[in-house]
Regions:
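Compositionally biased, low-complexity segments
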Residues: 2-3, 15, 64
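Intrinsically disordered, low-complexity segments enriched in Ser/Pro/Gly/Ala and basic residues
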Residues: 5-6, 18
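Positively charged n-region of N-terminal signal peptides that target proteins for export
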Residues: 10-16
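Sec-dependent N-terminal signal peptides
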Residues: 16-24
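Cleavable N-terminal signal peptides
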Residues: 19, 29-30
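Flexible, solvent-exposed loop/hinge segments and secondary-structure transition points
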Residues: 31-153, 159-164, 168-196
Length: 196
């Protein structure tokens, strides 16, 4: 009888140890997706040939309303910082995926996305959005008249909300770039008029 009890305890111990090992593997996989993947300085060095200027776009009510619609949340900030060299701009967004923020940076040139990077990923799932093969889909995307992307971005199983977050950030970057370029044209026209 003791031998039967002893073997039963042995089976239960092995089952318990296996459970802990599997739990550890799942936890490590989850934690492996969380982390800092690129610094802002590194991103700017990658997308600009010369050191970009840090600039500020002051947001009026109309721009804030547009951003609120695009980002699907109330955007209450009065200004947004961006980086610029010539016609190229870079924008950083800190948007919620499923539960936690995803810090992403998007470079735009000539009204097209030229680079997307995940600076910091804090979600426990959906980390595949940081992969180059996924982010490359955004390159050359432009903004339609209805503020949508001109390219279809393929989703990732288990990362639906992270993908939507990056889509919204990409649209916001394109819209903000468009606003900055329009402001430049208006300022240049005013300068030309005042010179006459």
């Amino acid at each position: 009888m003791l031998a039967g009890v002893s073997s039963q305890i042995g089976v239960e111990m092995r089952y318990l140890m296996l459970s802990f090992l599997l739990l550890g593997a799942v936890t490590n996989t989850t934690l492996a997706q969380i982390g800092v993947y690129q610094t802002l300085d590194s991103f700017n060095a990658e997308v600009f040939t010369t050191s970009p200027d840090s600039e500020t776009l002051w947001l009026n009510d109309d721009i804030r309303d547009q951003l609120s619609t695009i980002l699907n949340r109330i955007y209450g900030q009065l200004r947004i910082r961006y980086w610029r060299s010539g016609e190229r701009t870079a924008w950083v967004f800190n948007e919620i995926g499923k539960e936690r923020p995803i810090t992403n940076a998007i470079a735009v040139d000539g009204g097209k996305i030229v680079h997307v990077s995940i600076l910091e990923y804090r979600e426990s799932r959906g980390g595949e959005v940081k992969l180059e093969s996924f982010r490359r889909q955004f390159v050359d995307a432009q903004l339609t008249e209805k503020d949508k992307l001109t390219k279809k971005i393929n989703g990732i199983t288990g990362a639906t909300l992270s993908v939507k977050t990056l889509n919204r950030s990409a649209i916001a970057a394109l819209k903000l770039h468009e606003i900055v370029m329009q402001n430049d044209r208006l300022e240049n026209n005013e300068d030309e008029i005042s010179l006459r």
